[in-house]
Amino acid sequence: YEQYRYKNQVLYGENTNLYNPYIGELNNAGGIDKKNAKSYTDNYMTEGILSRLQYNYDGKYFLSASYRRDASSRFHKDHRWGNFGSVGGAWLINHEKFMENVKWVNMLKLKASWGVQGNDRLLITVNGVQRDNWYAYQDQYDVNYANGQYSLILKYKGTKDLTWETSYAFNIGTDFELFNNRLNGTIEYFSRKTVDLLYNKPIPVSSGISTGYEPTNVGDIMNKGVELDLNGIILRGKDYEWAM
């Protein structure tokens, strides 16, 4: 079990016409037009229940599995929890008996894995600067006071149904070390699909919402490919080695 909590409290003020520029106190100034004080608090919390299983048989066969259930305060309580995990396995082929006479293979491993991962981060633009949106599912307002009257101005349109962005990843490949470790590397195929992308969707002014966008889960992304990583020793001497 794990829990993370973030709380950031900010209080600041400003004034003009400093009497002494080396004294940073509001009472050291006589300004009226720019006299101002503001404060805000950011709250964020995640909670997770996790487990992991690892198995090794005879130094040749390896299995692993993990599962976690996470909650994020960025989402409404009805959509706060997500289920994630992974499974993987590896076979150290060079430890098999049929490889005993294959001297030019120092290590040969076949590996594969599948996993699910979640993302809850969504940014918001405040005064031209992007920062974390800690309350993405809630409508957010600015308080305005003029002529003795209070008013609320909508600055961010929340989405109650917002939930985790989820990525599914599959990898299969091989690691190898050959020719007395002169050549080693990895060949791996990967496939990654992300669903329920977290995105600030633009909305028309005619909707009556002046913020210009609202958070939503929209669209999928698919990435596939092959990765090749090779390292070789070109020259090897008693006191030196040249690799690339």
Tell me what each language-model feature is.
Residues 1-244:
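Extracellular/periplasmic, surface-exposed regions of secreted and cell-surface proteins
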